[in-house]
A protein has these predicted regions:
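Catalytic beta-strand/loop cores that center a nucleophilic Ser/Cys/Thr
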Residues: 331-421, 437
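A glycine-rich, often tryptophan-bearing local segment used as a flexible ligand/cofactor-contacting loop or short
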Residues: 280-360
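Alpha-helical scaffolding within the catalytic cores
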Residues: 218-221, 261-264, 290-293, 391-397
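Stable alpha-helical elements in mature extracytoplasmic
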Residues: 245, 278, 291-294, 425-429
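Long beta-sheet-rich domains in secretory-pathway and surface-associated proteins
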Residues: 1-224, 230
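Structural motif
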Residues: 273-278, 306, 407-411
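Aromatic-Pro/Gly-enriched surface loop or interdomain linker
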Residues: 199-278, 416, 434-437
Length: 438
């Protein structure tokens, strides 16, 4: 057996040999080559172009269905066996020995010379106060320096560094920027540019059971300027299975406090204008029967209670509503499902913000889940919507007057919409919070 040649189209490398290969004998061949400067970065093929809703945009039919990219560099090794020539294709990989795990390897990939990761994906502004972002600039090649600029929509102001300098590979530089809108600023996308070109971030996934994964999204974030009215309220939040609704309500300058269920009393609840239960609170709270009784007393004496979705399976109590309702598995998974207003004159549709169909544009992932499918006439349904070819679902938002207060049960996915900066969802939740304002 003889080695005839080794070549790599990615590197414009080709070298001929006439070397005999002996059985089970290692051969180490050392050669130098220059890696072309304009190799494309190793972006997963399905992320190279912007995607549409629910679908990636891939031009090459040969790539569709592949679990990963073709190798960024692949060598063709030709050997002669008798009268036949056999070609082997081998990807370029990096190998090393870990003292615990033994031999490790990962794919050789092409990175941008410099990446810029922003510490947030969405920034939400309810006023003109400045907020801070951190941009981590990393060199993947030595001696990188130049201009760095923040490109932003009209009506926004950005203050921060305009230059960077990195001498060594993997050197990091964390830059602070302060961003603020004027009163007429529109929501939009903020981008980082390096030397006049849109920058990429670099994200990495590392697990023992899969090959290390890296991808390079555009270095950008969504700026959301909320144009809405609020009524000052003191809000208590009873955390359920875990969500970030309370944290995002703080953006609106509400006083909001997470309530502990330990030793909770009706007197404690009456310190709040509004009490909100987190998602699946009555599925996970061990003291649910006692807490539910307190909450209904709180409502009857003038409180405003907002109960976010629970599932009918493994409820800790079924007595957390003032009038009968039946939780189902009804949901609307199409985030753009058309909404029908069932009661335009209801306060939740009008105060302190007038809701329109435009407020239900640009929602993410779904409208909501686990809607009731039967309820007492004491509840007022507010919306109707449905997935394609399904019956209308009217149980997403049910509001009832109970004693001196208001009780709201909702399966609307505020826990998804608020972190995504969906302004219409903020407006709707603000209106629910503002019930019982008299």
């Amino acid at each position: 057996m003889k080695l005839k040649s080794i070549s790599c189209k990615n590197f414009n490398f080709h070298k001929k040999f006439s070397k005999s290969l002996k059985e089970n004998q290692k051969n180490i061949l050392k050669n130098k080559t220059i890696v072309p400067a304009k190799l494309p970065i190793s972006q997963p093929y399905w992320l190279e172009k912007p995607s549409s809703l629910g679908a990636y945009n891939v031009d090459s039919l040969q790539l569709i269905g592949r679990a990963e990219n073709n190798p960024s560099a692949e060598f063709l090794i030709s050997v002669e066996v008798g009268d036949a020539t056999i070609d082997y294709r081998r990807p370029l990989i990096f190998k090393w020995n870990d003292p615990v795990k033994g031999e490790q390897n990962k794919n050789w990939i092409v990175c941008p010379k410099v990446t810029a990761n922003i510490d947030q994906k969405v920034m939400i502004f309810s006023n003109e106060s400045a907020q801070k972002i951190l941009v981590t600039v990393v060199a993947h090649s030595a001696n990188q320096k130049g201009d760095i600029n923040i490109i932003h929509p009209q009506g926004w102001k950005v203050e921060g560094p305009t230059e960077y300098s990195l001498k060594t590979v993997d050197q990091e530089l964390v830059l602070e920027y302060f961003i603020s809108p004027n009163k007429n600023a529109n929501s939009g996308v903020l981008k980082v540019q390096i030397n006049g070109v849109d920058a990429h971030a670099m994200n990495t996934i590392v697990y023992d059971h899969i090959t290390e994964q890296r991808w390079f999204p555009k270095s950008e974030l969504q700026l959301v300027h909320l144009n809405l009215n609020t009524v000052p309220k003191k809000i208590g939040y009873l955390m359920g299975a875990g969500d970030l609704v309370d944290q995002h309500l703080k953006i609106l300058k509400y006083y909001i406090n997470q309530i502990s269920t330990k030793d909770l009393t009706l007197k404690d609840l009456k310190n709040y204008d509004v009490v909100i239960t987190g998602v699946r609170f009555f599925n996970v709270e061990e003291k649910a029967p006692y807490i539910a009784n307190l909450l209904l007393k709180y409502v009857s004496q003038g409180g405003n209670l907002i109960v976010q979705y629970n599932t009918s399976y493994r409820l800790k109590t079924k007595n957390f509503y003032p009038y009968p309702l039946q939780i189902s598995r009804d949901r609307v998974t199409q985030e753009d499902a058309q909404v029908t207003f069932l009661n335009d004159s209801h306060p939740v549709m009008n105060f302190p913000n007038k809701l329109t169909k435009n407020d239900f544009n640009n929602w993410v992932q779904e409208r909501g889940l686990y809607f009731p499918n039967a309820w007492s006439k004491d509840y007022q349904p507010i919306f109707s919507w449905n997935d394609f070819n399904e019956e209308p679902k009217k149980g997403s938002l049910l509001i009832a007057k109970y004693g001196k207060g208001y009780y709201t049960y909702t399966g609307i996915s505020f826990f998804r919409q608020l972190p995504a900066g969906v302004s219409g969802a903020y407006k709707l939740l603000v209106n629910i919070i503002s019930l019982n304002n008299d």
